[in-house]
Amino acid sequence: MRIYETMFIIKPDIAEEEREKIAQGVVDYLKEKLGAHVDNVDRWGIRKTAYPLKKYNEADYTIVYFRGEGLDITVLESYFRVRPEFLRWQTFRRIDLEKKEKKQSRKEEGSENSEKVEE
């Protein structure tokens, strides 16, 4: 199963409750439209940007970790593109986390096999 991370930046002049709804809307979209399993949502809140984004020096940052098989990420990119409240977004595959998870599962399988041999 592939693991993805998406970070999106929301305009800071939107009310806090509305920004929460927007972030939850992304999570719901991932679950309902893409069929993804959301592992973690990390809300950073309003932070200073490295450079002005559409005349904003601050923005609300959110990172979402999700997983799925055969996900069409371009659909998620379109979701961000048509909504003006998003200043920036980036989605990428986390191959490092996939490898770590595979290594962990192999280690667990190895310990199960050694227990069976001892019995």
UniProtKB/Swiss-Prot annotation:
<comment type="similarity">
    <text>Belongs to the bacterial ribosomal protein bS6 family.</text>
</comment>
<dbReference type="GO" id="GO:0070181">
    <property type="term" value="F:small ribosomal subunit rRNA binding"/>
</dbReference>
<keyword id="KW-0694">RNA-binding</keyword>
<keyword id="KW-0687">Ribonucleoprotein</keyword>
<dbReference type="InterPro" id="IPR014717">
    <property type="entry name" value="Transl_elong_EF1B/ribsomal_bS6"/>
</dbReference>
<dbReference type="GO" id="GO:0005840">
    <property type="term" value="C:ribosome"/>
</dbReference>
<dbReference type="InterPro" id="IPR020814">
    <property type="entry name" value="Ribosomal_S6_plastid/chlpt"/>
</dbReference>
<protein>
    <recommendedName>
        <fullName>Small ribosomal subunit protein bS6</fullName>
    </recommendedName>
</protein>
<keyword id="KW-0699">rRNA-binding</keyword>
<dbReference type="GO" id="GO:0005737">
    <property type="term" value="C:cytoplasm"/>
</dbReference>
<dbReference type="InterPro" id="IPR035980">
    <property type="entry name" value="Ribosomal_bS6_sf"/>
</dbReference>
<feature type="region of interest" description="Disordered">
    <location>
        <begin position="99"/>
        <end position="119"/>
    </location>
</feature>
<comment type="function">
    <text>Binds together with bS18 to 16S ribosomal RNA.</text>
</comment>
<keyword id="KW-0689">Ribosomal protein</keyword>
<dbReference type="GO" id="GO:0006412">
    <property type="term" value="P:translation"/>
</dbReference>
<dbReference type="GO" id="GO:0003735">
    <property type="term" value="F:structural constituent of ribosome"/>
</dbReference>
<dbReference type="InterPro" id="IPR000529">
    <property type="entry name" value="Ribosomal_bS6"/>
</dbReference>
<dbReference type="GO" id="GO:1990904">
    <property type="term" value="C:ribonucleoprotein complex"/>
</dbReference>
<dbReference type="Pfam" id="PF01250">
    <property type="entry name" value="Ribosomal_S6"/>
</dbReference>
